[in-house]
């Protein structure tokens, strides 16, 4: 089965996301998928909160004149904006955009908040939905018209150096975030022609999906004073002079969820990192005639023992055990506990690891310790496995050879790294190799141009 077919299939079978909503590029997070989303974005919330960011919430509607204020910025996506033109039957005097991203409304407000250098820095974020009229082929959680989960952070500083340090902090936060999820990444500085509209420069995180295409999963932008000059975010310096704030912004989206699914999954279904699994341990009672009460009693006893520390579920559905096993393997539950009469008699408990598909037994007395240790080991294993696959997708060439690059990207895909040379680093190179230049990157101590087929 090809990756794209597998991906669509698993979203449905694992009950993550339903695409059957009657608007192209819009879908529904089902309860199981929503929980994965919630636990995933809890991680980034905590990382941002711990580093001095404050969560806020800005309106979804943006007046046309406000959106158009930063001309270079809006030029980057003006064809993708959804417009509200009527209130009821009355045509509006000023069209309202459904938020494609929030620089313009946030910076309008920052102008009102910032007066002196002591008002800085400002470090805020919001997790909201955004809208883009995607004309390309939409894909669930990858290319959407309603991006249901967009975490955008926006900062303002009194010096250029502080803004540079904020970019470094943002990169560090994202590295911790993706490391926690076991998602491998390549960090690159996007080319001038592909940077965020209105930014001084853009840093991006890309991962590689099983089909060898790269997926942009995070971006960090140094905005310099470009937006603050447009929006007049002016402050009084310690010496009494006036200056414009230095700004940064950085974001992630539902693509993180798509990456968890794509990178860790296998032909049987999901393999969820325990930290975001809605159910970390599923208990499956193996019911035998005449032993029903004993088995269910033991299953409940195990549940009570584990529920304080782990997300646990007893599957007491009246269906065959094999069907239950299959269902939980599709849903990627990291650890399964099987409870049968023989195990109870021998004071043993049977466990099954989703990542390795291995069964093993432990003494009842060791259960808590073994469950915790095994879940940690599962996380480490899937992370190492993901990085190994990622590394295998990287090809390093000693020089630019467009035909060789085209052949590799046609057969193997992945990322091709060629030594960085200023004279060849241009849009012409993209045309020659018929692929995307991700940007400048450092890999194992050397500077390269990264080239790939992208989503």
Curated annotation (Swiss-Prot):
Catalyzes the attachment of proline to tRNA(Pro) in a two-step reaction: proline is first activated by ATP to form Pro-AMP and then transferred to the acceptor end of tRNA(Pro). Can inadvertently accommodate and process non-cognate amino acids such as cysteine and alanine. One of its GO terms (molecular function) is ATP binding. This is Proline--tRNA ligase. The keyword Cytoplasm applies. It comes from the Archaea. Gene3D superfamilies: Anticodon-binding domain (3.40.50.800), Bira Bifunctional Protein, Domain 2 (3.30.930.10), C-terminal domain of ProRS (3.30.110.30). PANTHER family: BIFUNCTIONAL GLUTAMATE_PROLINE--TRNA LIGASE (PTHR43382:SF2), PROLYL-TRNA SYNTHETASE (PTHR43382). The gene is proS. It comes from Methanocaldococcus jannaschii (strain ATCC 43067 / DSM 2661 / JAL-1 / JCM 10045 / NBRC 100440) (Methanococcus jannaschii). Its EC number is 6.1.1.15. L-proline binds at residues 101, 103, 132, 221. NCBIfam families: proS_fam_I (TIGR00408).
């Amino acid at each position: 089965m090809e990756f794209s077919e597998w991906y669509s299939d698993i979203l449905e079978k694992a009950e993550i996301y339903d695409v059957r909503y009657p608007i192209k590029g819009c879908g529904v997070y089902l309860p199981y998928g929503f929980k994965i989303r919630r636990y995933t974005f809890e991680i980034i919330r905590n990382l941002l909160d711990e580093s001095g960011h404050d969560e806020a919430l800005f309106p979804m509607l943006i007046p046309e004149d406000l959106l158009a204020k930063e001309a270079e910025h809006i030029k980057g996506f003006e064809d993708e904006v959804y417009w509200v033109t009527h209130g009821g039957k009355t045509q509006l005097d000023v069209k309202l955009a459904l938020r494609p991203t929030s620089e313009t409304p946030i910076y309008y407000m920052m102008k009102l908040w910032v007066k002196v250098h002591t008002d800085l820095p400002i470090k805020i974020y919001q997790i909201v939905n955004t809208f883009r009229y995607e004309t390309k082929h939409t894909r669930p959680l990858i290319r959407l018209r309603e991006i249901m989960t967009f975490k955008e952070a926006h900062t303002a500083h009194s010096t250029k150096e502080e803004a540079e340090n904020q970019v470094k902090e943002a990169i560090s936060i994202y590295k911790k975030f993706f490391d926690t999820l076991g998602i491998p990444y390549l960090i690159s500085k996007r080319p001038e022609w592909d940077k965020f509209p209105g930014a001084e420069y853009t840093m991006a995180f890309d991962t590689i999906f099983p089909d060898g295409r790269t997926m942009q999963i995070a971006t960090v932008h140094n905005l310099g004073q470009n937006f603050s000059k447009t929006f007049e975010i002016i402050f009084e310096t310690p010496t009494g002079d006036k200056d414009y704030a230095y700004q940064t912004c950085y974001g992630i989206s539902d693509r993180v969820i798509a990456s968890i699914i794509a990178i860790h999954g296998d032909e049987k279904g999901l393999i969820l990192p325990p930290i975001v699994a809605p159910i970390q341990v599923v208990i499956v009672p193996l019911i035998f005639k005449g032993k029903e009460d004993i088995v269910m009693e033991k299953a409940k006893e195990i549940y009570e023992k584990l529920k304080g520390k782990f997300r646990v579920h007893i599957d007491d559905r009246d269906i065959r055990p094999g069907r239950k096993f299959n269902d939980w393997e599709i849903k990627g539950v990291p650890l399964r506990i099987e409870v049968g009469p023989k195990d109870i008699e021998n004071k043993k408990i049977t466990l099954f690891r989703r990542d390795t598909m291995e069964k093993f037994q432990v003494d009842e007395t060791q259960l808590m310790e073994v469950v915790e240790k095994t879940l940690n080991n599962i996380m480490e294993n899937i992370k190492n496995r993901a990085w190994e696959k990622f590394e295998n997708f990287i090809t390093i060439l000693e020089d630019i050879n467009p035909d060789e690059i085209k052949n590799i990207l046609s057969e193997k895909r992945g990322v091709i790294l060629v030594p960085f040379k200023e004279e060849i680093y241009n849009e012409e190179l993209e045309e020659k190799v018929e692929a995307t230049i991700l940007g400048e990157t450092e890999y194992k101590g050397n500077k390269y141009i990264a080239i790939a087929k992208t989503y």
